[in-house]
Structures are given as C-alpha cells and as structure tokens.
Amino acid sequence: MVCKCDCKNQNCSCNTGTKDCDCSDAKCCEQYCCPTASEKKCCKSGCAGGCKCANCECAQAAH
C-alpha cells in the first residue's frame, strides 16, 4: 500500500516510522484543490470541482 500524506499533521496515515511523508503540494491534493480548471494555484480543501491545479498530481477528480 502506498503511504498517503496527511498534510494537516505532516505524517503518513500508514506511517511505520521508517519513512518521512512527502507533503509537497503535488502530493497533497486532498488539501489543495481549485474551484475552477482555470485556477493556476492550489487552493484550500473543501472547494468544489476537485483538484485541477497544474502543480497537483491528482489520482482522482474529487474525493
């Protein structure tokens, strides 16, 4: 299982204590999303439309 980053705590939800979590914007789309596809920056979580930022590598359109 891939370790998912918890950006709020900057820890992995499946942290085994042997590896740091990558909490960069690109790895933390659950925390950074944009209301529209035209947005060029990452926004705070809770907005509609899911992650559409150029610097966010999202596996899902929304969560």
Swiss-Prot record:
Q: Under what conditions is it induced?
A: By cadmium.
One GO biological process this protein is involved in is: response to heat
* Alphabetically ordered keywords of this record: Cadmium, Metal-binding, Metal-thiolate cluster
One of the record's GO molecular function terms: zinc ion binding
Q: Which InterPro entries match?
A: Metalthion_nemt
What the protein does comes down to: This protein binds cations of several transition elements.
**The record's note on its domains:** All cysteine residues are arranged in C-X-C groups. These are thought to be the metal-binding sites in other metallothioneins.
Regarding protein family, the annotation reads: Belongs to the metallothionein superfamily. Type 6 family.
Supply the name of the protein. Metallothionein-2
Which species is this record about? Caenorhabditis elegans
